[in-house]
């Protein structure tokens, strides 16, 4: 299948690669179906792109590429809701805020997107019990809130 996007050109994908977000993503609750594709320009980033609205693509990155000791716990209810049987079946990304100044590019470590790659379902979580910043600089080791 093909998706002609506004910012990322023509993206090709298989229907089996569609990730369903039953609750949508905060700010885009009306959109439920997305594909995750590597960004061509940079192997650090991915694009989580809606297949329901060709204008909506969210830049994301793996938090583990940024902060090696990033961790949080999924409770039993969330594990069941996302049908997670094995931790190897999940892929975690976080939203990135781009900026023309490299030092001002940030990643939101407070709200990871958890994707069950076996079941192709996902959800963005808000971490209550862990003190991660919403704006963590991608290209320097300092935290700014």
Swiss-Prot record:
Organism: Clostridium kluyveri (strain ATCC 8527 / DSM 555 / NBRC 12016 / NCIMB 10680 / K1)
UniProt name for this protein: Flagellar assembly factor FliW
This protein's UniProt keywords: Bacterial flagellum biogenesis, Chaperone, Cytoplasm, Translation regulation
Subunit structure: Interacts with translational regulator CsrA and flagellin(s).
Function: Acts as an anti-CsrA protein, binds CsrA and prevents it from repressing translation of its target genes, one of which is flagellin. Binds to flagellin and participates in the assembly of the flagellum.
PANTHER family: FLAGELLAR ASSEMBLY FACTOR FLIW
Name of the gene this protein is made from: fliW
Annotated GO CC locations: cytoplasm
Compartments (UniProt record): Cytoplasm
InterPro entries according to UniProt: Flagellar_assembly_factor_FliW (IPR003775), Flagellar_assmbl_FliW_dom_sf (IPR024046)
Pfam entry (one): FliW
Single biological process term from Gene Ontology: bacterial-type flagellum assembly
Entry-linked Gene3D superfamilies: BH3618-like
Family assignment from sequence similarity: Belongs to the FliW family.
């Amino acid at each position: 299948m093909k998706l002609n996007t506004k910012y990322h050109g023509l993206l090709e994908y298989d229907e089996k690669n569609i990730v369903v977000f039953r609750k949508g993503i905060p700010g885009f609750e009306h959109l439920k179906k997305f594909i995750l594709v590597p960004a061509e320009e940079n192997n650090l980033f991915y694009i989580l792109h809606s297949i329901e609205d060709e204008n909506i693509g969210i830049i994301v990155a793996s938090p583990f590429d940024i902060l090696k000791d990033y961790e949080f716990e999924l409770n039993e209810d969330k594990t069941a809701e996302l049908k997670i049987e094995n931790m190897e079946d999940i892929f975690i990304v976080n939203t990135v805020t781009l900026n023309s100044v490299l030092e001002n590019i940030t990643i939101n470590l407070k709200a990871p997107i958890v994707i069950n790659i076996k079941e192709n379902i996902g959800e963005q979580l808000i971490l209550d019990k862990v003190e991660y910043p919403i704006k963590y600089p991608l290209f320097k080791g300092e935290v700014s809130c």
